Swiss-Prot record:
It comes from the Bacteria. The keyword Protein biosynthesis does not apply. This is Spermidine/putrescine import ATP-binding protein PotA. It comes from Escherichia coli O1:K1 / APEC. Disulfide bonds: none annotated. The complex is composed of two ATP-binding proteins (PotA), two transmembrane proteins (PotB and PotC) and a solute-binding protein (PotD).
Amino acid sequence: MGQSKKLNKQPNSLSPLVQLAGIRKCFDGKEVIPQLDLTINNGEFLTLLGPSGCGKTTVLRLIAGLETVDSGRIMLDNEDITHVPAENRYVNTVFQSYALFPHMTVFENVAFGLRMQKTPAAEITPRVMEALRMVQLETFAQRKPHQLSGGQQQRVAIARAVVNKPRLLLLDESLSALDYKLRKQMQNELKALQRKLGITFVFVTHDQEEALTMSDRIVVMRDGRIEQDGTPREIYEEPKNLFVAGFIGEINMFNATVIERLDEQRVRANVEGRECNIYVNFAVEPGQKLHVLLRPEDLRVEEINDDNHAEGLIGYVRERNYKGMTLESVVELENGKMVMVSEFFNEDDPDFDHSLDQKMAINWVESWEVVLADEEHK
């Protein structure tokens, strides 16, 4: 989350495929998308991420042509498609329910779109079989949907969506109906398929782990607005505000007060009663309130016994949760704040398996913290 962990950013040479400009949408007089601008690049896997009701599915439906905008423009490959019917947009959508035809075979489900487009009969079989090979279902062509597993149905829906070679594939929470293990498997398969096809994917989800795993770029939304737009690493390690920080994974938020600025990067501050140096990349004044954000895995803990003294935030272990590779501890600071700490499991460390009520000192590597201004005390 800090300077010492940043990777070099790769230059973005992708060209725009979809451009949303000044998009506004209301339902029953209620504004759900007040003013949205978004560019989606050729060949990228972009995820719209946010809580229920944030507007992400509405944006997807506007791109697909399943809803009409109240104002603004939608461009696809430099062509204005704002008022173009959905069937003429060269955009396909995979819904959460998959929407397979139960009376048709897998082959006929995949071929349906080609027949609707009046594709020459001689082309249909090779194109359908090519699509089924891409999703490793060529031997299932004559089965009915009820004879397939959930993951196989998912792949049929994707094959049907890509068989007519759309410019853009939209996926609306299309993994959420799968069990955990199958969902993890499909995340990898979907990303590999996207790379193989070279088609631009726009994926909608409220699952943060899913977004971090699959995406080239994540757009975090709240109340119809974009809160942050960046790579998974940027979103996780450099959240721009408290909403993004709290929505993406676990995070600890410490209250801090500025004492003085030391140099261009560092500020001396009181953090939950402890004086320390923090990295602040914006102007601050003595006495100003700040938030210091640290992920559980970025914290370091040390047991304190009666005969030793340790620097750091002092607290006591209140809960321990064994997670296989990690041990998660909840530490209560002396001021009552609860802090989550995650440590990689090390059975050779005699002090690793902390006892309940064990006194602890919490520290972190300087510059790994993210510091945000306190909006309420500006």
